[in-house]
Swiss-Prot record:
It is an enzyme of class 2 (transferase). Belongs to the PAPS reductase family. CysD subfamily. GO terms for biological process: hydrogen sulfide biosynthetic process; sulfate assimilation. It catalyses: sulfate + ATP + H(+) = adenosine 5'-phosphosulfate + diphosphate. The lineage of its organism: Bacteria, Bacillati, Actinomycetota, Actinomycetes, Mycobacteriales. Pathway: Sulfur metabolism; hydrogen sulfide biosynthesis; sulfite from sulfate: step 1/3. Keywords: ATP-binding, Nucleotide-binding, Nucleotidyltransferase, Transferase. GO terms for molecular function: ATP binding; sulfate adenylyltransferase (ATP) activity. Its EC number is 2.7.7.4. The keyword Secreted does not apply. It comes from Nocardia farcinica (strain IFM 10152). This is Sulfate adenylyltransferase subunit 2. Residues 286-308 are annotated as: Disordered. InterPro entries: PAPS_reduct_dom (IPR002500), Rossmann-like_a/b/a_fold (IPR014729), SO4_adenylTrfase_ssu (IPR011784), Sulfate_adenylyltrnsfr_sub2 (IPR050128). Heterodimer composed of CysD, the smaller subunit, and CysN.
Length: 308
């Protein structure tokens, strides 16, 4: 018996298929929403997502703003990169900081990674979505990153309280997406769901997408804590007694708040060298994210509470 498989994009390469699918998702999401927004974390996935969105609506301006939920604890290089992107004429960037966190001085040292993430990121995101009335938010999450993200749909319905219920997910057959929602509900849309980390890097190489320099190896001051290399990025970093930062050749596979982001030893200083490194690696991309190591604050639990 011969099985016939319909190819929606005959003659396209793997990356071209991914690109075409993502652009279709972005356009459909905008068509089905009243007030969309794109979450912008300054990382490589956000940079690829922004690049795809521009392709989707070129030569027009983006029909939605970018939203950066700021924790005040990102790397200095990330803020410099964000400000450079925000200065581009076709973009509108909203920066939101949870005022409760500012007032209480929430930080990863005194309050721990779980509370820091819950207050700054989860509650901050919900505040921003409510304040601006956004009914659909694009995110750069991919299914290969983490098991709870692997089972989330491309169009993910959130309750009026921004909660995710895995049991209420809708079928998405033949790339047919359903963005309908009840009053008060919103939708999170993930156009990069089917991309892998290697796909992202190969696309960055093909499209010459600029990135935060932290993704490339350089001598940086780090301390090792529980097997994780933490970069000393500013004078807020609290060193343990006798702890002395050492200059090591490292880079980051994933970026977040600098006291909670682990670097990896690397000599990859260019995109082709990073791609080569990706072809040989056997470790998880998010192994350096300290927030993922907190069993009481698993990714699925955070997503159910309203996290990205």
């Amino acid at each position: 018996m011969t099985t016939l498989v319909h190819d929606e994009h005959p003659g396209l390469t793997h990356l071209q298929r991914l690109e075409a699918d993502s652009i279709q998702i972005i356009r459909e999401a905008v068509a089905e929403s009243e007030r969309p927004v794109m979450l912008y974390s300054i990382g490589k996935d956000s940079s690829v997502l922004l690049h795809l969105a521009r392709k989707a609506f070129r030569p027009s301006r983006l029909p939605f703003p970018l939203l950066h939920v700021d924790t005040t604890w990102k790397f200095r290089a990330m803020y410099a990169f964000r400000d450079a992107v925000a200065a581009e004429p076709d973009l509108d960037l909203i920066v939101h900081r949870n005022p409760d966190c500012v007032a209480q001085g929430i930080n990863p040292f005194d309050h721990g990674s779980a509370l820091h993430t819950q207050m700054w990121k989860t509650e901050g995101l919900k505040q921003a979505l409510d304040q601006h009335g956004f009914d659909l938010a694009f995110g750069g999450a991919r299914r290969d990153e983490e098991k709870s993200r692997a089972k989330e749909r491309v169009f993910s319905i959130r309750s009026a309280q921004h909660r995710w219920d895995p049991k209420r997910q809708r079928p998405e057959l033949w790339r047919l997406y359903n963005a309908s929602k009840r009053p008060g509900e919103s939708v999170r849309v993930f156009p990069l769901s089917n991309w892998t980390e290697l796909d992202i890097w190969q696309y960055i190489h093909r499209e010459a997408i600029p990135l935060v320099p932290l993704y490339f190896a350089a001598l940086r001051p780090v301390v090792e804590r529980d097997g994780t290399l933490i970069m000393v990025d500013d004078d807020r970093m609290r060193l343990d007694p006798g702890e002395v930062p050492q200059e090591r050749m490292v880079r980051f596979r994933t970026l977040g708040c600098y006291p909670l982001s682990g670097a990896i030893p690397s000599t990859a200083t260019t995109v082709p060298e990073v791609v080569q490194e990706m072809l040989l690696t056997t470790s998880s991309e998010r192994q350096g994210r300290i927030i993922d190591h907190d069993g009481s604050a698993s990714m699925e639990k955070k997503k159910q509470e309203g996290y990205f």
